[in-house]
Amino acid sequence: MAFAGTMGKDKEVRFDPCWSQEAVLVVNRLHPLAAYDEISLDDLSDQHLISYNLTGPLGAELTNLVKDCDLAIDYLYSDEITLASMVVGNPDMMAIACRSWLLDSFDQDIKLVRIKEAPEAFHQMYLCSSALMRHSKTVDEFIDIVLDYCSKSLE
């Protein structure tokens, strides 16, 4: 079992939606754009941007988000911790990332700026489990508890 995104349908994996993540611009607090709460991708054409590797679970969503924009983005990274670390280390660099609790530990050094073009539910997260094997009662109860919790948090 895992909480993860999806790379598409897989007959061996059961994907139960749990929550979604918003796409944000991760900005070093020393950068002038840290004064903004929201920004358009069109305003970033002359900025140094980084984001996730397009071969990972965010590739389709990220490609769709920026498809109509003339942006220079280095698609090299696999997680929010690395993206935030790069932005902290270089105030001129910004990252397009999913809003995640992992970014909270960088709060003193970064600002998360909403991206106008990004849907609120940019990236769907799932509780993933085996679709082929029978689960123990404990695992089934855990799945039920998680899905119940997730459904209530979405209300």
Predicted regions: what is each one?
Residues M1-G8, N28-R29, E80, I96-W101:
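Beta->alpha turn/N-cap motifs
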Residues K11-E22, Y36, T82-L132:
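Beta-alpha-beta core module
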Residues D42, Y126-E155:
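Extended ligand-binding regions for polar small-molecule ligands
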Residues K11-A23, V27-L49:
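Flexible hinge/capping segments at coil-to-helix
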Residues V26, S51-Y52, Y77-S78, A95:
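Active-site-adjacent beta-strand anchor residues
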Residues Q47-C69, R99, L103, H135-I143, ...:
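Secondary-structure junction motif
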Residues G5, L71-L83:
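Short beta-strand-to-loop elements that line the ligand-binding cleft
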